[in-house]
């Protein structure tokens, strides 16, 4: 994958990018084989490879810059790095990021400044359903001071962006590296984003955990379903279940199974 920001030394989030992906997989397979060597009965299946770019269906963007010139991406030290064109994201994310920047300008949302402890908008969290192509957008704010402005201008954003299905505000008042706070305010009539893997519907709420690589997640869930198919299991507990991907796949098998999800 060719990444301008990585080559320029501005973003090192994909720290192994200089190593060819096939070589990365081979190294991981070798490490796994060494770890599993004491267990002679273990069968190691081939690794499931991911697409190298355009696969990440969730973006966590630090908002920096100013309300007139917002930057979505990361901070390299104290230097804002715009990752709106990051090749990890599907093609539909770039125009979405452009609309979000325009909305920040229109609503006058001041990015939070870490050193000064000033400003309101900390993060943008954007997710897309690969089943429908629809989006969920979350604004992570320091307080509710900008809530009225977001509500006022939301209709404009929805008009410009018909694929925006769910929009919410998360309040995170603490000055530390915490992604989100406990309070979530849903601003749209729709409060879930529907995804579908292997013909099984999954419903994402703003604060629920969900896999970011849709193709690999679908293969992972299908593998668990296949392995459990022959087991004489009548009850399934899905621990740290998130939206229930594993549990729902196991419960939807040909056997009658009672499912309990625990998050």
Task: Report the location of each language-model feature.
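Accessory RNA-recognition modules of RNA-modification enzymes
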Residues: 1-263
């Amino acid at each position: 994958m060719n990444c301008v920001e990585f080559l320029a030394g501005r973003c090192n989030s994909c720290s192994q990018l200089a190593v060819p992906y096939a070589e990365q997989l081979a190294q991981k397979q070798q490490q796994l084989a060494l770890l599993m060597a004491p267990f002679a009965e273990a069968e190691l299946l081939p690794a499931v490879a991911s697409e190298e770019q355009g696969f990440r269906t969730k973006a966590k963007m630090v908002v920096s810059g100013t309300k007139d010139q917002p930057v979505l991406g990361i901070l390299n030290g104290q230097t804002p790095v715009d990752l709106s064109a990051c090749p990890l994201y599907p093609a539909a994310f770039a125009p979405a990021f452009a609309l979000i920047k325009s909305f920040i300008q229109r609503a006058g949302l001041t990015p939070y400044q870490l050193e000064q402890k000033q400003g309101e908008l900390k993060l943008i969290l954007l997710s897309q359903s690969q089943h429908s192509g629809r989006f969920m957008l979350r604004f992570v704010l320091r307080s509710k001071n900008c809530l009225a402005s977001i509500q006022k201008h939301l209709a404009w954003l929805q008009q410009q962006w018909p694929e925006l299905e769910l929009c919410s505000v998360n309040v995170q008042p603490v000055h530390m590296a915490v992604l989100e706070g406990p309070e979530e305010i849903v601003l749209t009539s729709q409060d879930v984003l529907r995804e579908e893997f292997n013909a099984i519907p999954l419903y994402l709420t703003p604060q629920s955990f969900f896999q970011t690589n849709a193709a690999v997640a679908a293969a992972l869930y299908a593998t668990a379903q296949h392995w459990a198919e022959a087991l004489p299991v009548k009850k399934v507990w899905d621990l740290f279940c998130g939206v229930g991907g594993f549990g729902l796949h196991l419960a939807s098998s040909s056997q009658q199974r009672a499912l309990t999800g625990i998050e």
